[in-house]
Amino acid sequence: MGDTGLRKRREDEKSIQSQEPKTTSLQKELGLISGISIIVGTIIGSGIFVSPKSVLSNTEAVGPCLIIWAACGVLATLGALCFAELGTMITKSGGEYPYLMEAYGPIPAYLFSWASLIVIKPTSFAIICLSFSEYVCAPFYVGCKPPQIVVKCLAAAAILFISTVNSLSVRLGSYVQNIFTAAKLVIVAIIIISGLVLLAQGNTKNFDNSFEGAQLSVGAISLAFYNGLWAYDGWNQLNYITEELRNPYRNLPLAIIIGIPLVTACYILMNVSYFTVMTATELLQSQAVAVTFGDRVLYPASWIVPLFVAFSTIGAANGTCFTAGRLIYVAGREGHMLKVLSYISVRRLTPAPAIIFYGIIATIYIIPGDINSLVNYFSFAAWLFYGLTILGLIVMRFTRKELERPIKVPVVIPVLMTLISVFLVLAPIISKPTWEYLYCVLFILSGLLFYFLFVHYKFGWAQKISKPITMHLQMLMEVVPPEEDPE
């Protein structure tokens, strides 16, 4: 009897073990459709619905405006192809971080993680959630601005929801991304089809003399590109989750080749649709371009526009959280952040500590009043690191010849993108110099202080503080260090 019970328990243990993954690490659960959804869902946020006037205000004419939108899509595609070579050559998650590490060593990689994790990505997450909150609140406060406390509480709730979803399951996070990407493509399709119908009916007067009065100075064109490329930001998001892509050698470049041209086509056609209904002056005066379009074309069903803009923003926020959590995870794994941030949930197999940390920092940024100016001043730092990363691709063509390159782009593409990155970093400083850009550079360089204190020299007192914190957090969240996946 006892032998039978013992045998049964052993069989049960084997059955349980057979259902567990071989290693406690991030699993390859994302396919091509999820990859395309992350690219499209992260790039298309609230910008194209709310404020495409930023490009028009610098070009001051319809023709150059549409050309800029198309050119920005081409540049985003070229940049993403450079990242595709990097992502298939160095198949680690974390976006620019592992590429900077391989090309230049730990210091540039640490400065990237420092700037991205403390300011750039959390503020973007917070702004997207605040935008979502304002659109959800708007129908309940017709004729007046909703109270800030309501907006901020709802934004914090959105951050909590998205962080929870992505901490619970990789698959659940990708399902949420797929659903909201589908929802935003529905409203994009409605706007495009409505605009093309109006265009076919002869509403073309706003396209007559479309280059008249164009502002073609170097400063104006550079700022137009700067604003347009900001709307395309997110083209590199798939490189943050390379380790979770099934067959990354195929799916990474394919998702880029499909996803970014799809976004480019949507952006151009949506702008065409806007101009069939509004003159350039009316578009510049509109507070929310898509809402104005809806009021003029979709009435009495115009209420669907703010609803789907809310879906769009929450989808962009989910994509940002999904990918940025992996950057914290990889930085923690390399010892550039608290070690516990690189740990994996035993039950969920997600980088839960990294996602929770990211959500907390983003929530802190909601507390102050207006942080849009902060994001604007730090946005040029993104192109600084894009440029450094793509330059690293050129450097590794000479220093890391032994690395396998399933995808190899012509060298002219990374050279061109490096020069464009330099231009985009310097253009706003030269055209409109302010002290804030200097403060931004000083903040990035201040990361060196933390690097030498806590990473390079690893003082004993710092280890004594971090070890008990790591141990208690590990027990609280049921997380363990990631294991190497045996080949």
From Swiss-Prot:
GO terms for molecular function: antiporter activity; broad specificity neutral L-amino acid:basic L-amino acid antiporter activity; L-cystine transmembrane transporter activity; neutral L-amino acid transmembrane transporter activity; peptide antigen binding; protein heterodimerization activity. Residues 56-62, 138-147, 194-217, 275-302, 432-434 are extracellular. It is a multi-pass membrane protein. Pfam families: AA_permease_2. Changing residue 99 to H: In CSNU; uncertain significance. Gene3D superfamilies: Amino acid/polyamine transporter I. Changing residue 426 to P: In CSNU; uncertain significance. The modification Phosphoserine is found at residue 18. Changing residue 123 to M: In CSNU; partial loss of amino acid transport activity. Changing residue 230 to A: Abolishes amino acid transport activity. GO terms for cellular component: apical plasma membrane; brush border membrane; plasma membrane. Changing residue 482 to L: In CSNU; severe loss of amino acid transport activity; no effect on localization to the apical membrane. It catalyses: L-leucine(out) + L-arginine(in) = L-leucine(in) + L-arginine(out); L-histidine(out) + L-arginine(in) = L-histidine(in) + L-arginine(out); L-arginine(in) + L-phenylalanine(out) = L-arginine(out) + L-phenylalanine(in); L-cysteine(out) + L-arginine(in) = L-cysteine(in) + L-arginine(out). Changing residue 170 to M: In CSNU; type III; severe loss of amino acid transport activity. Residues 1-22 are annotated as: Disordered. Expressed in the brush border membrane in the kidney (at protein level). Kidney, small intestine, liver and placenta. Residues 1-15 have a biased composition (Basic and acidic residues). Residues 1-31, 85-110, 239-251, 326-351, 392-410, 451-487 are cytoplasmic. Changing residue 182 to T: In CSNU; type III; partial loss of amino acid transport activity. It is linked to Cystinuria: An autosomal disorder characterized by impaired epithelial cell transport of cystine and dibasic amino acids (lysine, ornithine, and arginine) in the proximal renal tubule and gastrointestinal tract. The impaired renal reabsorption of cystine and its low solubility causes the formation of calculi in the urinary tract, resulting in obstructive uropathy, pyelonephritis, and, rarely, renal failure. Disulfide-linked heterodimer composed of the catalytic light chain subunit SLC7A9 and the heavy chain subunit SLC3A1. The heterodimer is the minimal functional unit. Assembles in heterotetramers (dimers of heterodimers) and higher order oligomers; the oligomerization is mediated by SLC3A1 likely to prevent degradation and facilitate heteromer trafficking to the plasma membrane. Interacts with CAV1. Associates with SLC3A1 to form a functional transporter complex that mediates the electrogenic exchange between cationic amino acids and neutral amino acids, with a stoichiometry of 1:1. Has system b(0,+)-like activity with high affinity for extracellular cationic amino acids and L-cystine and lower affinity for intracellular neutral amino acids. Substrate exchange is driven by high concentration of intracellular neutral amino acids and the intracellular reduction of L-cystine to L-cysteine. Belongs to the amino acid-polyamine-organocation (APC) superfamily. This is b(0,+)-type amino acid transporter 1. It comes from Homo sapiens. The lineage of its organism: Eukaryota, Metazoa, Chordata, Craniata, Vertebrata. The gene is SLC7A9.
